[in-house]
């Protein structure tokens, strides 16, 4: 079996850094073109970071910083 299947990804966000719902550019890295939140296995985030990311994206959607769905996609 190739070792690349089991290679651990490093988290793109440092463990101590907070995920801010007002930082739209950072949040856009973790959503698809259609506006869906990427799963943890693709983002490389820890479980806590993924929960915080989900909360931040949902807050940004509620206050209209991010769209719920992308009309172009």
From Swiss-Prot:
Pfam families reported for this sequence: Ribosomal_S18
Protein keywords: Ribonucleoprotein, Ribosomal protein, RNA-binding, rRNA-binding
GO cellular component, one term: cytosolic small ribosomal subunit
Coiled coil: none
Domain of life where this protein originates: Bacteria
Single GO biological process annotation from the record: translation
Molecular function GO terms recorded: small ribosomal subunit rRNA binding; structural constituent of ribosome
Record has Transmembrane helix as a keyword: no
Function: Binds as a heterodimer with protein bS6 to the central domain of the 16S rRNA, where it helps stabilize the platform of the 30S subunit.
Subunit structure: Part of the 30S ribosomal subunit. Forms a tight heterodimer with protein bS6.
Homology family: Belongs to the bacterial ribosomal protein bS18 family.
Protein name in UniProt: Small ribosomal subunit protein bS18
Gene name of the encoded protein: rpsR
């Amino acid at each position: 079996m190739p070792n690349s299947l089991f290679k651990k990804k490093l988290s793109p966000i440092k463990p101590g850094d907070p995920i801010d719902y007002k930082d739209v550019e950072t949040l856009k890295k973790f959503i698809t073109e259609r506006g869906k939140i990427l799963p943890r296995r693709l983002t490389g985030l820890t479980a806590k970071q993924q929960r915080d990311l989900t909360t931040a994206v949902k807050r940004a959607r509620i206050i209209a910083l991010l769209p719920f769905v992308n009309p172009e996609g």
